[in-house]
Design a protein with these regions (language model features):
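N-terminal type II signal-anchor transmembrane helix
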Residues: 2-34
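N-terminal leader/targeting segments and the immediate start of mature chains
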Residues: 32-83
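N-terminal mature ectodomain segment of secretory-pathway/periplasmic proteins
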Residues: 65-150
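Short, hydrophobic/aromatic-rich segments at coil-to-beta transitions
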Residues: 79-85, 110-118, 141, 190-199, ...
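Short solvent-exposed loop/turn micro-motifs enriched in small/polar/acidic residues
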Residues: 99-101, 126, 181, 191-193, ...
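Short amphipathic beta-strand and strand-loop transition segments with alternating hydrophobic
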Residues: 107, 185-190, 245-246
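Flexible, processing/modification-adjacent segments and terminal tails
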Residues: 143-202, 235
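Gly/Pro-enriched, hydrophobic low-complexity segments
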Residues: 197-284
Length: 286
């Protein structure tokens, strides 16, 4: 969920394409996606615990306890993996309104934390921007490609890109809420009665987000102080915020069905992702 300044470049690469080229690109992209998914599954290990025990809430900040009591029932099975499908709109520019419809499918594993997001943004009739956004074994990956054939950039590795992708994993964890439990590696620190900090460490990386809770105890927003935005070929650090709503029950847990993600720029808040969960399938620990 990066998407800054790709639209003009993508449309300049290809204004129209034949059906055969589109099909070839889709097939090639599907193969690349399968390879990433195989890498992700190879990192997967089973959760240490099979079920959530409410006793692990003892000592947590008050708003965090209220959250888990609101979304989980004692004995809830621990999520090991999830497949999430989304629909929505994506703004491809940080400086103007270039909202385009998208669909995506995301695979998430919680031990060790990782995901592969496979997105398809409709730039124009017959022209799709395919995007891989991933975090696998401490490596971050961002690859947008017109038709799955013409790569606009291919950034992967540790350091800045990996840190940003681990942030994404954590900010989206309310979709798979057992991943936010202390027993699953998240450390919570009190801020006030409506706010707490959540820290996740994976390998040499550590990320901390500020979480705000509503009157109902549910997570309403989360923010990182600085995340790298890819603007052209330059990384610019800005606060990064996600807002979540429309909580519904899935497999006994309450999870948000809609979300909006924004950069908090010096010029103001700039949303660039507005999405709805269209399908959500969990796999649980033994």
């Amino acid at each position: 969920m990066h998407g800054v300044g790709w639209a003009a470049l993508a449309l300049g690469v290809l204004v129209s394409a034949g059906v055969g080229l589109v099909a070839f690109g889709a097939q090639r992209w599907a193969g690349s996606t399968l390879a990433l998914l195989a890498q992700l599954e190879a990192t997967r290990t089973p959760p240490d615990l099979a079920r959530y025990d409410v006793s692990e809430l003892e000592g947590l900040p008050a708003p965090v306890q209220r959250y888990f009591r609101a979304v989980l029932k004692d004995g809830q099975r621990i999520i090991a993996a999830a497949t999430v499908k989304h629909t929505g709109t994506f703004n491809l520019s940080l400086t103007s309104e270039q909202w385009k419809p998208f669909t995506s499918q995301q695979r998430v594993v919680t031990h060790a934390p990782g995901f592969v997001w496979n997105g398809h943004v409709a730039l124009a009739p017959g022209i799709a921007l395919h995007v891989h956004d991933a975090y696998i074994a401490g490596v971050g990956i961002l690859e947008p490609s017109v038709l799955g054939l013409y790569s606009l950039t291919d950034v992967q590795g540790g350091g800045e890109i990996a840190l940003g992708e681990l942030m994404r994993y954590l900010i989206e964890a309310s979709w798979y809420p057992t991943a936010l439990l202390p027993s699953q590696g998240v450390h919570w620190q009190a801020v006030d009665d409506r706010t707490a900090n959540a820290t996740l460490v994976d390998r040499s990386l550590s990320v901390t987000m500020r979480v705000s809770f509503g009157d109902d105890g549910l997570i309403r927003s989360a923010c990182f102080e600085a995340r790298g935005a890819m603007i052209g070929k330059v990384i610019v650090h800005m606060p990064w915020e996600g807002r979540w709503s429309d909580y519904q029950e899935r497999e006994g847990m309450r999870v948000p069905m809609t979300g909006e993600v924004a950069w908090l720029t010096p010029q103001g808040r700039k949303p660039y992702y507005r999405g709805t969960v269209s399908d959500l399938v969990y796999e649980f620990g033994p």
